Amino acid sequence: MCIRDRIEDNPKMILKEKKNCSMGVAMQMVADGRADAMISAGSTAALVMGGTLIVKRIKGVKRPSLTPVMPGLNNMYILLDGGANVDCRPDMLRQFAVMGSVYMNKIMGVDNPKVGLLNVGAEEEKGRELEQETYALLKNSTLNFTGNVEARNAALGEVDVVVTDGFTGNIYLKTVEGMGKFMKASLKKIFFRNLGTKIGAMFTMKGIKEISKQMDYRETGGSPVSYTHLTLPTKLEV
């Protein structure tokens, strides 16, 4: 089922004043068991809010998480949180790590996914109080926690799950999107500079297109909302 609402609509308006809008109806269908999933091109805030209030969270899950699938050097990886929660506590990030591990294992088929905590350095003592306390929780968990991961290394295959708060995660996500556009525009500018570079481009065009496609965020085009029965098992150790 493909659902589309005007993205400029206010989240509360969609859920309260427009109870019969496509997004609200679709969520109720999922909640009632008449649909197994829904896809929306509407307001992200309304989708997250409606999912929490209508579809409901798995018992024990504190906050939802936007979980974009990101392009990596040798494999795809996921980011939690991509922007649903600006302010997070360490226990929430631990839950994001659990949800991300389950998603990578059950949906992406990755055995024992590697979890990394997005930070300003790889050392254990790096970061704010949030990262330091989260590090301790993940270190003592049963997850395959590999430690802190710097933004520059996240896409190089070091981890399968990148965990951070929604504020940092959204900046990271949009930076990656922007770099993809920058690289595509830069390559085009370089290869079409003169006749010699145009001839060179003819021999490398296939590779350039592959790189551009890999870096294009439209290849994924959306993000699962991790917290409900839509994406996770009904029993979850959190």
Where are these regions (language model features)?
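Short, glycine-/small-residue-rich phosphate/pyrophosphate-handling segment
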Residues: 71-104, 218-222
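Glycine-rich phosphate/nucleotide-binding loop
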Residues: 55-63, 71-79, 158-162, 166-232
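A glycine- and small-aliphatic-rich helix-loop capping segment at beta-alpha/alpha-beta transitions
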Residues: 46, 50-67, 133-138, 181-182
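Flexible, glycine/charged-enriched surface loops at secondary-structure junctions
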Residues: 107-115, 144-152, 193-202, 217-223
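Phosphate/nucleotide-donor binding subsite
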Residues: 4-35
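Conserved small/polar residues in nucleotide/adenosyl-binding loops
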Residues: 1-5, 228-234
